[in-house]
Amino acid sequence: MGKTLFENIWDEHVIYEREDGDVLLYIDRHMTHDLHFRSFAAFKENGLTLREPDKTFGVPDHSVPTTAKTIDDIPEGEMRTAVEVLAEAAEEMGFTHYSMTDDRHGIVHVVGPEQGITLPGLTLVCGDSHTSTHGALGCISFGIGSTEVQHVMATQTVWQRKPKMMRINITGKLGFGVSGKDVILAVIREISAAGGTGYAIEFAGPVIEAMSMEGRMTVCNMAIEAGARSGIIAPDEKTIEYCKGRPYSPTGTEWDK
């Protein structure tokens, strides 16, 4: 029996499998944000070291008011502390940090694709349920908890159990003014807000193929609203064209591979 896209990527990243079915999974990319500031403090208190600084990327977005341009614009309090701690952790540990004054700054799940951090065939995690957004580029992506954030930082791995597989094939064509958001809401209406519980959903079919990359990201983002662990879309020429030339995308012979 053949494997799904998700299963192929998963199996390539399994380091060890326990008798209970849980596996130690290698993580290619770790996105983090300001609400992990307590994880950074605990990480430091436990005397741990960031294993692979070049594979962690920090983006302050959860506590940043839309009107704030710099940290000084955020009122004193926990929100400001969260942003400050992320910046301090990045400087101390040496991981990439897209600060509020960086032109590349934005929402963590948008920065990843825009910068080429998110690429087909990778595993990517972040301490946020909507990490599934990145699956639109053909990678395995899922949210993790605060303790798991520390585990990934220390080992570049995480313990997980492989989800069940579900494929949703969407036929027909998008009508005028109909977006990816409408499509995924229609899917959730059909399968319910718990219909994807325990599954990784692969979205496919002509409607998905016709969507922009941003539309695909919206669909995968909201797989969580169907209860799914993750969403994924097989990469195609549109995906490759989107990734081409971005800062962290391969170049030269590496791109040709």
Regions from the PLM with identified roles:
Residues 1-257:
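Fe-S-dependent hydro-lyases/dehydratases of central metabolism
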